[in-house]
UniProtKB/Swiss-Prot annotation:
GO MF annotation list: RNA binding
Similarity-based family: Belongs to the snRNP Sm proteins family.
Keyword Electron transport assigned: no
Biological process according to GO: mRNA splicing, via spliceosome
Name this polypeptide is given: Probable small nuclear ribonucleoprotein G
Originating species: Caenorhabditis elegans
Keywords: Cytoplasm, mRNA processing, mRNA splicing, Nucleus, Ribonucleoprotein, RNA-binding, Spliceosome
Gene from which the chain derives: snr-7
């Protein structure tokens, strides 16, 4: 059985992130935590809908296997 390596997301902690999820869903919010499977806790999360609207989700957990693309809203050094 292979050992799971934790994702290197520490530099993104407490930063605002844009996430594209499977099913063509988009969420943005502040990364507050993660685990070795890249499940993430996102605070002040907002889901952007296809019709241009948005839904405030508050604090939510996003499963790592549903993340397609993840990028910070501002440059990280």
């Amino acid at each position: 059985m292979s050992k799971t390596h934790p994702p290197e997301l520490k530099k993104y902690m407490d930063k605002e992130m844009d996430l594209k999820l499977n099913g063509n869903r988009r969420v943005s919010g502040i990364l507050r935590g993660f685990d070795p499977f890249m499940n993430m806790v996102i605070d002040e999360a907002v889901e952007y809908q296809k019709d241009g609207g948005s839904v405030n989700l508050g604090m939510t957990v996003i499963r790592g296997n549903s993340v397609v693309i993840m990028e910070p809203k501002e440059r990280i050094s």
